[in-house]
């Protein structure tokens, strides 16, 4: 099996990707298990940050790398919190603090102006100097609610209402969410690219 470094320390992401990518002969290992620190995210877009993270992991390990950069873009806020989704209310902010700040920011915004979408970019680099990385983007439209609902998921899921499902992302089962989410879409594109290429 070809070892691939995943540019994250998130055990959940590693487990999810490891099971799916093993069918392609890829053995996914978290960068933290290989002693690699997180890359500095200096890009201005999800794509730039995902490439920075993948390139850093590949360079430090000499292995192919996969990186994910994702976040929430709210239309009325010009795409914010965007690449700052995880640190919207400060550098070491919790999910709850970020969620509360967003609800406070949108408190006077009418219901018909609360559209948002989650974005996920997955990047695969064959090596650190790979001039043609595989870049896959998934996007998931929804509406920001006025209060949290549901206990599943993480981040902004409890206030991200999915009209097609009639509930928030936090109220979906893991399987339901994976089938339609931004990360699920990006992962499907990556698997298709690896299968075909």
Curated annotation (Swiss-Prot):
Entry annotation: catalytic residues: 69 (proton acceptor)
One Pfam family in the UniProt entry: Ham1p_like
Protein's UniProt keywords contain Zinc: no
Keywords annotated in UniProt: Hydrolase, Magnesium, Metal-binding, Nucleotide metabolism, Nucleotide-binding
Co-factor requirement: Mg(2+)
GO biological process, one term: purine nucleoside triphosphate catabolic process
Protein's UniProt name: dITP/XTP pyrophosphatase
Species the sequence originates in: Salmonella typhi
Gene: rdgB
């Amino acid at each position: 099996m070809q070892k691939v470094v995943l540019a994250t320390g998130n055990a959940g992401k590693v487990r999810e990707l490891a099971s799916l990518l093993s069918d392609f002969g890829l053995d996914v290992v978290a960068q933290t298990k290989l002693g690699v620190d997180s890359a500095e995210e200096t890009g201005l877009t999800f794509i730039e940050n995902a490439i920075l993270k993948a390139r850093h992991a590949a360079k430090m390990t000499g292995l192919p790398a996969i990186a994910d950069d994702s976040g929430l873009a709210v239309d009325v806020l010009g795409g914010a919190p965007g690449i700052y989704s995880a640190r919207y209310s400060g550098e070491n902010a919790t999910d709850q603090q970020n969620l509360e700040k967003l609800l406070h920011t949108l408190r006077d915004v009418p219901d018909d102006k609360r559209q948002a979408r989650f974005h996920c970019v997955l990047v695969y680099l064959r090596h650190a100097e790979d001039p043609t990385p595989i870049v896959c983007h998934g996007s998931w439209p929804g509406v920001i609610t006025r209060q949290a609902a549901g206990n599943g998921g993480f981040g902004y899921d409890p206030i991200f209402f999915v009209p097609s499902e009639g509930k928030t992302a936090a109220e979906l089962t893991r399987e339901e969410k994976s089938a339609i989410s931004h990360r699920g879409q990006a992962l499907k594109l990556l698997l298709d690219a690896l299968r075909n290429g």
